[in-house]
Regions:
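A short beta-strand-turn-helix
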Residues: 1, 41-46
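Structural micro-motif
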Residues: 47-57
């Protein structure tokens, strides 16, 4: 599975999430891709991100499993990724 983040430079929630994502990637091995809605417009829009940024889209072999948007604490973010099977306890 992979996690795709759609964000923007001007998005304050995206900036907040950068540190959460960085910490998550230090602690867990995750296939993670990130697109900027303005700089990577075609790629970002192909995921139909919606109106709330950042949006996190969990993909399994090019099929969307789930998505969630907004700001999360580190623990909330990790919990969401565990719920959908991106992170397993033994990965830590």
């Amino acid at each position: 599975m992979k996690v795709v983040k759609i964000g923007a430079i001007w998005c304050s929630g995206c900036l907040v999430m950068n540190s959460v994502i960085s910490k998550t990637l230090k602690n867990y091995t995750i296939d993670f891709q990130e697109y900027d809605i303005d700089m990577d417009e075609a790629e970002a829009k192909s995921y139909q991100p919606g109106d709330v940024l950042p949006v996190f889209i969990v993909m399994d072999q090019d099929q969307e499993v789930t998505r969630f948007a907004g700001e999360y604490s580190y623990d909330e973010f990790v919990s969401k990724l565990k719920e959908v099977g991106v992170i397993h306890e033994e990965d830590h």
